[in-house]
UniProtKB/Swiss-Prot annotation:
Its EC number is 2.7.4.3. Monomer. Its main location: cytoplasm. Catalyzes the reversible transfer of the terminal phosphate group between ATP and AMP. Plays an important role in cellular energy homeostasis and in adenine nucleotide metabolism. AMP binds at residues 31, 36, 57-59, 85-88, 92, 156, 167. It catalyses: AMP + ATP = 2 ADP. It comes from Paraburkholderia xenovorans (strain LB400). The lineage of its organism: Bacteria, Pseudomonadati, Pseudomonadota, Betaproteobacteria, Burkholderiales. This is Adenylate kinase. Consists of three domains, a large central CORE domain and two small peripheral domains, NMPbind and LID, which undergo movements during catalysis. The LID domain closes over the site of phosphoryl transfer upon ATP binding. Assembling and dissambling the active center during each catalytic cycle provides an effective means to prevent ATP hydrolysis. The gene is adk.
Length: 221
């Protein structure tokens, strides 16, 4: 099982990724984790990545793809792998294809933006303990106060509505085009690569976590 998980920030990809990797016994491939591990290990690719990072520059797609290929050689990828958060752009997807990275499924978790804004902007947390609440789905007993200590709850900057909207705008511009890219490849094939076209699956990300999990498993049969 080799798959890519697509969906907007706040669509629930991380939660479903955990279920999928446990069910199929495959690792979740995170480019951030790969970069940190390669830098820490001092591999040639890691040292090259460190030069970019130390200079405050984005690591090139070519270097990321080389790291991906290196990571996929590890024994834990023998039965497959799950990409969550990569590729983010068409050039990255194209580079993966040209590098011969095989994908069986692309699974999109579809959630309307209005719902994502409600989900993310409603989060509240107690800074000292890490306890989390949601003004709509899991409210504290007393509005704005932690259940245990009675101390004020905070809203993280990442969860503020204007920040959420900006993240969704970036997704719309950079990552959403991947939906069309993979849909077209799945439907029409691509003679420029020997790779077999992946199957494209779209599921609704609305409902309970368990309902979405069952939809995901059904889509990957």
């Amino acid at each position: 099982m080799r798959l890519i998980l697509l969906g907007a920030p706040g669509a629930g990809k991380g939660t479903q990724a955990t279920f999928i990797k446990e069910k199929f016994g495959i690792p979740q491939i995170s480019t951030g984790d790969m970069l940190r591990a390669a830098v820490k290990a001092g591999t040639p690719l890691g040292l090259e990545a460190k030069r970019f990072m130390d200079a405050g520059e984005l690591v090139t797609d070519e270097l990321i793809i080389n790291l991906v290929k290196e990571r996929l050689q590890q024994p834990d990828c023998a039965n497959g792998y799950l990409f969550d958060g990569f590729p983010r752009t068409i050039p990255q997807a194209e580079a993966m294809k040209q590098a011969g990275v095989a994908i069986d499924y692309v699974l999109e978790i579809d959630v309307p933006f209005e719902e994502i804004i409600v989900r993310m902007s409603g989060r509240r947390s107690h800074a000292a303990s890490g306890r989390t609440y949601h003004v709509k789905f899991n409210p504290p007993k007393v509005e704005g106060l932690d259940d245990v200590t009675g101390e004020p709850l905070i809203q993280r900057d990442d969860d503020k509505e204007e920040t959420v909207k900006k993240r969704l705008e970036v997704y719309e511009a950079q990552t959403k085009p991947l939906i069309e890219y993979y849909t077209n490849w799945a439907k029409n094939g691509d003679s420029s690569t020997p790779l077999k076209a992946p199957q494209y699956r779209r599921i609704s990300g609305l409902g309970s976590v368990d309902e979405i999990r069952e939809r995901a498993f059904e889509a990957l049969k």
